[in-house]
Protein backbone atom coordinates (compact mmCIF):
# COMPACT_ATOMS: atom_id res chain seq x y z
CA UNK A 1 0.00 0.00 0.00
CA UNK A 2 1.40 3.38 -1.01
CA UNK A 3 1.59 6.15 1.56
CA UNK A 4 0.75 9.60 0.25
CA UNK A 5 3.49 12.12 0.80
CA UNK A 6 2.55 15.45 2.35
CA UNK A 7 1.84 18.02 -0.29
CA UNK A 8 4.62 20.54 -0.84
CA UNK A 9 4.03 24.09 -2.06
CA UNK A 10 4.35 24.61 -5.77
CA UNK A 11 6.81 27.05 -7.30
CA UNK A 12 3.98 29.46 -8.13
CA UNK A 13 2.79 29.50 -4.51
CA UNK A 14 6.34 30.15 -3.28
CA UNK A 15 6.70 33.07 -5.68
CA UNK A 16 3.39 34.53 -4.50
CA UNK A 17 4.54 34.32 -0.87
CA UNK A 18 7.82 36.05 -1.70
CA UNK A 19 6.03 38.87 -3.53
CA UNK A 20 3.54 39.33 -0.72
CA UNK A 21 6.35 39.68 1.83
CA UNK A 22 8.05 42.50 -0.07
CA UNK A 23 6.97 45.87 1.35
CA UNK A 24 6.18 48.77 -0.89
CA UNK A 25 9.01 51.32 -1.05
CA UNK A 26 8.60 54.62 0.73
CA UNK A 27 7.86 57.15 -1.98
CA UNK A 28 6.31 60.60 -2.08
CA UNK A 29 2.89 59.02 -2.61
CA UNK A 30 3.55 56.52 0.17
CA UNK A 31 5.86 58.43 2.56
CA UNK A 32 5.14 56.32 5.61
CA UNK A 33 4.76 52.95 3.92
CA UNK A 34 1.20 53.17 5.23
CA UNK A 35 -0.15 50.07 3.50
CA UNK A 36 2.80 47.97 4.62
CA UNK A 37 2.68 48.38 8.37
CA UNK A 38 3.08 45.19 10.32
CA UNK A 39 -0.06 43.33 11.30
CA UNK A 40 0.86 43.78 14.94
CA UNK A 41 0.85 47.57 14.55
CA UNK A 42 -2.64 47.51 13.06
CA UNK A 43 -3.87 45.15 15.72
CA UNK A 44 -3.06 47.72 18.37
CA UNK A 45 -5.70 50.05 16.95
CA UNK A 46 -8.19 47.49 15.72
CA UNK A 47 -10.09 47.59 18.98
CA UNK A 48 -10.92 51.25 18.32
CA UNK A 49 -13.35 50.32 15.56
CA UNK A 50 -16.26 50.59 17.98
CA UNK A 51 -15.04 54.14 18.36
CA UNK A 52 -14.22 56.23 21.34
CA UNK A 53 -12.18 58.70 19.29
CA UNK A 54 -8.96 57.83 21.09
CA UNK A 55 -5.68 56.27 20.02
CA UNK A 56 -3.76 53.76 22.09
CA UNK A 57 -0.80 55.07 24.03
CA UNK A 58 2.57 53.36 23.91
CA UNK A 59 3.17 53.86 27.62
CA UNK A 60 0.37 55.15 29.83
CA UNK A 61 2.67 56.10 32.68
CA UNK A 62 5.38 57.77 30.67
CA UNK A 63 4.10 61.33 31.09
CA UNK A 64 4.02 61.65 34.87
CA UNK A 65 6.43 64.58 35.07
CA UNK A 66 5.74 66.07 38.47
CA UNK A 67 8.99 66.69 40.35
CA UNK A 68 11.02 69.31 42.10
CA UNK A 69 14.35 70.07 40.44
CA UNK A 70 16.00 69.56 37.08
CA UNK A 71 17.92 66.56 38.42
CA UNK A 72 14.71 64.58 38.99
CA UNK A 73 13.22 65.45 35.61
CA UNK A 74 13.14 62.27 33.57
CA UNK A 75 12.16 62.83 29.94
CA UNK A 76 10.25 59.81 28.57
CA UNK A 77 11.63 58.01 25.51
CA UNK A 78 10.24 59.24 22.19
CA UNK A 79 6.90 57.74 21.21
CA UNK A 80 6.40 55.74 18.00
CA UNK A 81 5.75 57.98 15.02
CA UNK A 82 2.42 56.47 13.96
CA UNK A 83 -0.02 54.50 16.05
CA UNK A 84 -3.30 55.01 14.23
CA UNK A 85 -4.53 55.97 10.79
CA UNK A 86 -7.27 58.52 10.29
CA UNK A 87 -8.95 59.69 7.06
CA UNK A 88 -6.80 62.30 5.32
CA UNK A 89 -9.54 64.88 5.01
CA UNK A 90 -9.59 68.66 5.16
CA UNK A 91 -12.21 68.96 7.88
CA UNK A 92 -12.60 72.22 9.84
CA UNK A 93 -9.93 73.01 12.42
CA UNK A 94 -10.32 74.65 15.81
CA UNK A 95 -6.88 76.24 16.21
CA UNK A 96 -5.95 77.51 19.68
CA UNK A 97 -2.87 79.74 19.46
CA UNK A 98 -1.06 80.06 22.80
CA UNK A 99 1.37 82.99 22.89
CA UNK A 100 3.98 83.26 25.63
CA UNK A 101 4.27 86.73 27.18
CA UNK A 102 7.40 86.19 29.26
CA UNK A 103 9.97 88.99 29.28
CA UNK A 104 12.28 86.96 27.02
CA UNK A 105 9.83 87.65 24.19
CA UNK A 106 10.64 91.38 24.40
CA UNK A 107 14.43 91.06 24.08
CA UNK A 108 15.61 92.65 20.77
CA UNK A 109 17.80 89.77 19.60
CA UNK A 110 16.18 88.47 16.41
CA UNK A 111 17.58 89.75 13.14
CA UNK A 112 14.83 91.26 11.00
CA UNK A 113 14.66 91.36 7.20
CA UNK A 114 16.46 94.73 6.96
CA UNK A 115 19.26 93.70 9.31
CA UNK A 116 18.01 95.54 12.39
CA UNK A 117 17.24 93.84 15.68
CA UNK A 118 13.70 93.03 16.71
CA UNK A 119 12.06 91.01 19.46
CA UNK A 120 10.30 87.67 19.31
CA UNK A 121 6.93 89.13 20.34
CA UNK A 122 6.72 91.46 17.34
CA UNK A 123 7.72 88.69 14.95
CA UNK A 124 5.31 86.24 16.57
CA UNK A 125 2.42 88.69 16.31
CA UNK A 126 3.03 89.19 12.59
CA UNK A 127 3.49 85.50 11.82
CA UNK A 128 0.35 84.57 13.78
CA UNK A 129 -1.70 87.12 11.83
CA UNK A 130 -0.32 85.79 8.53
CA UNK A 131 -1.07 82.22 9.64
CA UNK A 132 -4.67 82.98 10.65
CA UNK A 133 -5.47 84.96 7.50
CA UNK A 134 -3.91 82.32 5.24
CA UNK A 135 -5.75 79.45 6.94
CA UNK A 136 -8.98 81.44 6.59
CA UNK A 137 -8.40 81.77 2.84
CA UNK A 138 -7.82 78.01 2.58
CA UNK A 139 -11.04 77.15 4.44
CA UNK A 140 -13.39 79.76 5.87
CA UNK A 141 -14.87 77.22 8.30
CA UNK A 142 -11.64 77.10 10.35
CA UNK A 143 -11.95 78.70 13.78
CA UNK A 144 -9.24 80.40 15.83
CA UNK A 145 -8.74 81.35 19.46
CA UNK A 146 -5.96 83.29 21.21
CA UNK A 147 -4.59 82.37 24.63
CA UNK A 148 -1.81 84.32 26.33
CA UNK A 149 0.54 82.66 28.79
CA UNK A 150 2.57 84.25 31.61
CA UNK A 151 2.37 83.02 35.21
CA UNK A 152 -1.27 82.24 34.46
CA UNK A 153 -3.22 81.67 31.25
CA UNK A 154 -5.92 83.93 29.82
CA UNK A 155 -8.37 83.17 27.02
CA UNK A 156 -8.37 86.48 25.12
CA UNK A 157 -10.31 85.66 21.98
CA UNK A 158 -12.92 82.92 21.80
CA UNK A 159 -13.14 80.54 18.86
CA UNK A 160 -14.08 82.58 15.82
CA UNK A 161 -13.93 82.15 12.05
CA UNK A 162 -13.29 85.89 11.58
CA UNK A 163 -9.52 86.59 11.52
CA UNK A 164 -10.13 90.27 12.31
CA UNK A 165 -11.62 89.39 15.68
CA UNK A 166 -8.50 87.50 16.76
CA UNK A 167 -6.09 90.06 15.30
CA UNK A 168 -7.83 92.85 17.21
CA UNK A 169 -6.60 91.22 20.45
CA UNK A 170 -3.18 90.28 19.14
CA UNK A 171 -1.18 93.51 19.22
CA UNK A 172 -2.20 95.18 22.48
CA UNK A 173 -0.07 92.88 24.62
CA UNK A 174 2.75 93.42 27.12
CA UNK A 175 5.36 91.03 28.43
CA UNK A 176 6.08 90.41 32.11
CA UNK A 177 8.60 88.62 34.29
CA UNK A 178 7.38 85.06 34.83
CA UNK A 179 8.55 82.79 37.62
CA UNK A 180 6.73 79.61 36.57
CA UNK A 181 5.10 77.99 33.57
CA UNK A 182 1.77 76.41 34.48
CA UNK A 183 1.40 73.95 31.61
CA UNK A 184 -1.23 71.99 33.51
CA UNK A 185 -3.37 75.12 33.83
CA UNK A 186 -3.05 75.75 30.09
CA UNK A 187 -4.35 72.31 29.16
CA UNK A 188 -7.11 72.53 31.77
CA UNK A 189 -8.29 75.78 30.20
CA UNK A 190 -8.28 74.20 26.74
CA UNK A 191 -10.34 71.30 28.05
CA UNK A 192 -12.89 73.70 29.53
CA UNK A 193 -13.26 75.70 26.31
CA UNK A 194 -13.28 72.88 23.74
CA UNK A 195 -14.87 69.49 23.22
CA UNK A 196 -13.04 66.75 21.36
CA UNK A 197 -15.07 64.99 18.65
CA UNK A 198 -15.94 61.29 18.79
CA UNK A 199 -16.56 59.04 15.78
CA UNK A 200 -17.77 55.46 15.48
CA UNK A 201 -14.65 54.39 13.58
CA UNK A 202 -11.57 56.59 13.72
CA UNK A 203 -9.93 54.86 10.73
CA UNK A 204 -12.77 55.33 8.23
CA UNK A 205 -15.15 58.07 9.40
CA UNK A 206 -13.93 61.68 9.11
CA UNK A 207 -14.39 63.79 12.24
CA UNK A 208 -16.59 66.90 12.13
CA UNK A 209 -13.54 68.92 13.18
CA UNK A 210 -10.13 68.61 14.85
CA UNK A 211 -8.62 70.61 17.72
CA UNK A 212 -5.07 71.90 17.36
CA UNK A 213 -3.04 73.83 19.92
CA UNK A 214 -0.03 75.85 18.71
CA UNK A 215 2.25 76.97 21.54
CA UNK A 216 4.73 79.77 20.80
CA UNK A 217 7.02 79.56 23.81
CA UNK A 218 10.19 81.40 24.87
CA UNK A 219 11.60 80.99 28.38
CA UNK A 220 14.80 79.86 30.04
CA UNK A 221 14.76 76.11 30.70
CA UNK A 222 12.61 75.41 33.73
CA UNK A 223 10.46 72.51 34.78
CA UNK A 224 6.80 73.31 34.03
CA UNK A 225 4.04 72.78 36.55
CA UNK A 226 2.48 69.67 35.10
CA UNK A 227 1.04 66.37 36.23
CA UNK A 228 -0.83 64.08 33.88
CA UNK A 229 -4.45 63.63 34.91
CA UNK A 230 -6.87 61.14 33.35
CA UNK A 231 -8.72 63.83 31.34
CA UNK A 232 -5.39 65.11 29.98
CA UNK A 233 -4.29 61.59 29.12
CA UNK A 234 -7.48 61.08 27.11
CA UNK A 235 -6.97 64.43 25.39
CA UNK A 236 -3.42 63.57 24.30
CA UNK A 237 -4.50 60.11 23.14
CA UNK A 238 -7.40 61.43 21.07
CA UNK A 239 -6.52 61.16 17.35
CA UNK A 240 -8.25 64.50 16.72
CA UNK A 241 -6.12 66.55 19.13
CA UNK A 242 -2.75 67.98 18.06
CA UNK A 243 -0.17 69.88 20.09
CA UNK A 244 2.31 71.81 17.91
CA UNK A 245 5.18 73.75 19.46
CA UNK A 246 7.42 76.60 18.29
CA UNK A 247 10.13 76.91 20.95
CA UNK A 248 12.25 80.09 20.87
CA UNK A 249 15.35 79.47 22.99
CA UNK A 250 18.55 81.31 23.86
CA UNK A 251 20.68 78.80 21.97
CA UNK A 252 23.39 78.65 24.62
CA UNK A 253 24.58 75.49 26.31
CA UNK A 254 24.07 75.47 30.07
CA UNK A 255 26.32 73.77 32.59
CA UNK A 256 25.94 70.05 33.06
CA UNK A 257 24.10 70.40 36.36
CA UNK A 258 21.66 72.91 34.86
CA UNK A 259 18.72 72.20 32.61
CA UNK A 260 19.31 72.84 28.92
CA UNK A 261 16.87 74.17 26.35
CA UNK A 262 17.24 70.77 24.71
CA UNK A 263 15.75 69.16 27.83
CA UNK A 264 12.77 71.49 27.62
CA UNK A 265 12.34 70.80 23.90
CA UNK A 266 12.52 67.04 24.54
CA UNK A 267 9.91 67.38 27.27
CA UNK A 268 7.53 69.20 24.91
CA UNK A 269 8.03 66.46 22.35
CA UNK A 270 7.37 63.72 24.90
CA UNK A 271 3.81 65.00 25.43
CA UNK A 272 2.90 63.82 21.94
CA UNK A 273 2.13 60.12 22.48
CA UNK A 274 0.86 59.61 18.91
CA UNK A 275 3.76 61.08 16.94
CA UNK A 276 1.41 63.32 14.94
CA UNK A 277 2.35 66.78 16.23
CA UNK A 278 5.03 69.11 14.87
CA UNK A 279 7.77 70.65 17.04
CA UNK A 280 10.20 73.39 15.95
CA UNK A 281 13.02 75.15 17.78
CA UNK A 282 14.45 78.53 16.81
CA UNK A 283 17.42 80.35 18.35
CA UNK A 284 16.52 83.72 19.85
CA UNK A 285 19.62 85.29 18.30
CA UNK A 286 18.91 83.92 14.81
CA UNK A 287 17.12 85.44 11.82
CA UNK A 288 13.42 86.24 12.18
CA UNK A 289 12.85 84.46 8.87
CA UNK A 290 13.25 81.11 10.66
CA UNK A 291 10.23 81.85 12.82
CA UNK A 292 8.13 82.70 9.77
CA UNK A 293 9.27 79.49 8.06
CA UNK A 294 8.21 77.39 11.06
CA UNK A 295 4.77 78.96 11.14
CA UNK A 296 4.39 78.48 7.38
CA UNK A 297 5.10 74.75 7.79
CA UNK A 298 2.24 74.57 10.29
CA UNK A 299 -0.28 75.66 7.65
CA UNK A 300 -0.79 72.06 6.53
CA UNK A 301 -3.88 70.31 7.87
CA UNK A 302 -2.86 67.95 10.72
CA UNK A 303 -4.89 65.07 9.25
CA UNK A 304 -3.26 65.48 5.83
CA UNK A 305 0.36 66.13 6.71
CA UNK A 306 2.86 63.26 7.16
CA UNK A 307 4.85 62.59 10.30
CA UNK A 308 7.32 65.40 10.83
CA UNK A 309 10.31 63.16 10.15
CA UNK A 310 8.85 62.41 6.69
CA UNK A 311 7.99 66.02 5.82
CA UNK A 312 9.76 67.44 2.77
CA UNK A 313 9.53 71.01 1.52
CA UNK A 314 11.54 70.79 -1.71
CA UNK A 315 10.07 70.97 -5.21
CA UNK A 316 12.53 68.50 -6.71
CA UNK A 317 13.42 65.11 -5.26
CA UNK A 318 17.17 65.65 -5.72
CA UNK A 319 16.93 68.61 -3.35
CA UNK A 320 15.63 66.44 -0.50
CA UNK A 321 19.03 65.42 0.84
CA UNK A 322 20.41 68.95 0.61
CA UNK A 323 17.68 70.44 2.84
CA UNK A 324 17.04 67.47 5.10
CA UNK A 325 18.27 69.35 8.15
CA UNK A 326 15.91 72.25 7.46
CA UNK A 327 12.90 70.09 6.65
CA UNK A 328 12.96 67.89 9.73
CA UNK A 329 13.36 68.51 13.43
UniProtKB/Swiss-Prot annotation:
Keywords: Acetylation, Cell cycle, Cell division, Chromatin regulator, Cytoplasm, DNA damage, DNA repair, Mitosis, Nucleus, Phosphoprotein, Ubl conjugation pathway. SUPFAM superfamilies: vWA-like. The modification Phosphothreonine is found at residue 65. It is found in: Cytoplasm; Nucleus. Coiled coil: none annotated. The modification N-acetylmethionine is found at residue 1. Component of the ARISC complex, at least composed of UIMC1/RAP80, ABRAXAS1, BRCC3/BRCC36, BABAM2 and BABAM1/NBA1. Component of the BRCA1-A complex, at least composed of BRCA1, BARD1, UIMC1/RAP80, ABRAXAS1, BRCC3/BRCC36, BABAM2 and BABAM1/NBA1. In the BRCA1-A complex, interacts directly with ABRAXAS1 and BABAM2. Component of the BRISC complex, at least composed of ABRAXAS2, BRCC3/BRCC36, BABAM2 and BABAM1/NBA1. Identified in a complex with SHMT2 and the other subunits of the BRISC complex. GO terms for cellular component: BRCA1-A complex; BRISC complex; cytoplasm; cytosol; nuclear body; nucleoplasm; nucleus. Transmembrane segments: none annotated. Residues 95-298 are annotated as: VWFA-like. The modification Phosphoserine is found at residues 8, 29, 49, 57, 62, 66. The VWFA-like region is similar to the VWFA domain. Its presence reveals similarities between the structure of the 19S proteasome and the BRCA1-A complexes. InterPro entries: BABAM1, vWFA_dom_sf. Its main location: cytoplasm. GO terms for biological process: cell division; DNA repair-dependent chromatin remodeling; double-strand break repair; hematopoietic stem cell proliferation; mitotic G2 DNA damage checkpoint signaling; mitotic G2/M transition checkpoint; positive regulation of DNA repair; regulation of DNA repair. Residues 10-19 have a biased composition (Acidic residues). It comes from Homo sapiens (Human). Belongs to the BABAM1 family. Residues 1-84 are annotated as: Disordered. This is BRISC and BRCA1-A complex member 1. One of its GO terms (molecular function) is identical protein binding. Component of the BRCA1-A complex, a complex that specifically recognizes 'Lys-63'-linked ubiquitinated histones H2A and H2AX at DNA lesions sites, leading to target the BRCA1-BARD1 heterodimer to sites of DNA damage at double-strand breaks (DSBs). The BRCA1-A complex also possesses deubiquitinase activity that specifically removes 'Lys-63'-linked ubiquitin on histones H2A and H2AX. In the BRCA1-A complex, it is required for the complex integrity and its localization at DSBs. The keyword DNA repair applies.
